Amino acid sequence: MTLKEFEKIIEETIENLPDEIKQKLDNVVFIVQDYPDDEELKRAKTSKHNLLGLYTGIPLSKRGTSYGMYPTTPDRIFIFKANIERTCKTEDELRKKIKEVVLHEIGHYLGMSEAEVRRALKNF
């Protein structure tokens, strides 16, 4: 899948979110890379080929009243293209996995724990 096609699926996933969630996506950027770099691997405590996505930043649930009073760098959601592609056999599987990873990382952005994200994805 081309990078452009991959990014289009990410955009569609975000566009199809319920409005109440979409409106909360503030000061966050989505970054597509083939693999995580050393800093991201250290943060996630995993191997290069196992990580499909990673959220870095201050989750919404932990932002205090002073958040945004001063310029802040955007939170980042990394989506690791080559790792996701490696886990899928068909294009349909790939599309579903991209959507799942994007939703998973948005869950962390919203402040959900790993267990909460996994439960929410079962119902989505």
Question: How would you name each of these model-derived features?
Answer:
Residues M1-K97, Y109, A115-E116:
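Active-site rim/adjacent substrate-binding subdomains
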Residues E114-F124:
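Post-HExxH zinc-binding segment in Zn-dependent metallohydrolases
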